[in-house]
C-alpha cells in the first residue's frame, strides 16, 4: 500500500521517450525524513505532492486510489516549466504555523547546484502551492525567505538619524523662544527730543507747570509732537522740579540760619541752645578768675 500522504498521477499523453529515472529524494516533514525511490515517470506528466495531516488525508488517499481505477484523470495540475529535463531535487516541506484545520501548504522547489548545465535557464526557486481537493478557493504560490531578522543599522545611518533628531529639537526650542518673545509685550522706545523742542518746553514750563488741553494741543502741533509725548514730558518735569525744590528749600533754610547767626538775630528754636552755651562759657571764665586770685594770695603769704 502506498504512502497515504502522497499520490502521483500519470498524464495520459505521456510518451516513452521522455522517461528519466529519479534518484532518491529526501522528504523533510515536520522533522521526520523518509527515503523513497520513485519509478520512472514521464516528464510531461506533473508530479504532485498533496500535503496534509493524517486525520484528513487517510480518507482522501483511499478515495483517490479507488477513483483511479474508474476514471482516468479528473484533476490536472499545471506543467512544470522544464519538461525535457530530469530534476534531482530535494523537496522541503516547511513547518507551517497554521492550525491543523488548514488544508493548504506551500512547497518550495530548490534545484541542486550540481545538476546538468541545461538547468541554467530554469528559475532559481520554483514555488508551488498544493491544496486539498475539498477546498474551493485556489491559492497562489508564495515562498518566504528564512531570514526574517532586521539588518543592523550602519553607524552612518545612526549618526544621520541622531543629527536629524537634534535638528528637530533645536527647531522646537527656537520656535518656543520665538513664541515667548511674541507673547511678551514689546518695550516702548524712549522719545528723543531735540534741543529746540526742549527749549520751548522749558520756557512753557517756567510759565505754567500744568497745561490745559488746548495749550497742550497747540504745543504738540508747533513742536511736531503728539499730545501724549507733551503730557508725559510735563509729568516728568514736574517730578524733577519737586525733587529740586525740596533740595533747594533745605539749602535756603540752612543759608538763612547762618545769616541770622551772623547778624545776631537767632531763631526761637536756637535761643535755648545758644543761651546754655553762653552761660557755660561765663561760668568757666569766672572759675578761672577765682583760681587766679587764690594763686596770687598764696604767693603774698609766702613772702
From Swiss-Prot:
PROSITE patterns: HOMEOBOX_1 (PS00027), HOMEOBOX_2 (PS50071). It comes from the Eukaryota. One of its GO terms (cellular component) is nuclear speck. It is found in: Nucleus; Nucleus speckle. InterPro entries: HD, HD_metazoa, Homeobox_CS, Homeodomain-like_sf, MOX-1/MOX-2. Residues 157-170, 182-191, 289-303 have a biased composition (Basic and acidic residues). The keyword 4Fe-4S does not apply. Residues 63-191, 279-303 are annotated as: Disordered. PANTHER family: HOMEOBOX PROTEIN MOX, HOMEOBOX PROTEIN MOX-2. The polyhistidine repeat may act as a targeting signal to nuclear speckles. This is Homeobox protein MOX-2.
